[in-house]
């Protein structure tokens, strides 16, 4: 899943960033085969709307058009679900459909934790965490993820491209969530 804090370089390349919530920070660290992502964004939407949007696992495509499909595979008890999603990821002219299967835990009304299921998708391992904080009528979303892809990522430009893609996707997602808040 794509995780997240960041530097918005190339605003000219991603004009949707200016229309969406504000990206406060982002970073990507590459260590061997493992990536560590972090991003914080401020959404002009109430915490309850943001939480509902990011936990509607059967309808994630509604908040990000890069998500081609998402579904709950099974409920694993109170606040735990196994979720499968397919994301179309394009970097430059290369596109790939990435499958991820995660065991998702709704920790409380503002925290979600997802653990990749090894062998069930295109990742060897991964752990993601979403933390929401109300800031007046807005919400800060802090997303972190550590993952090891099961596919090749170019080592020299990979971290830079992943950060660019992450920032763009978070910006697109905030735009959709803010649109839902305005309805």
Describe the residue ranges of each PLM region.
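Bacterial N-terminal signal peptides that target proteins for export
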Residues: 1-11
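N-terminal signal peptide c-region/cleavage motif recognized by signal peptidases
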Residues: 15-16
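Hydrophobic ligand-binding cavity/cleft-lining segments
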Residues: 20-78, 94
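Short, low-complexity Ser/Thr-rich regulatory SLiMs
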Residues: 30, 74, 104-106, 130-136
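Short, surface-exposed coil-to-beta transition loops
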Residues: 36-38, 95-101, 123-129
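Glycine-rich portal/gate segments that line the openings of hydrophobic small-molecule binding cavities
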Residues: 42, 71-120, 172-183
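Sec-exported extracytoplasmic/periplasmic mature domains
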Residues: 52-65, 166, 170-182
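Beta-strand/loop substructures that line and gate deep hydrophobic ligand-binding cavities in soluble
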Residues: 117-164, 168
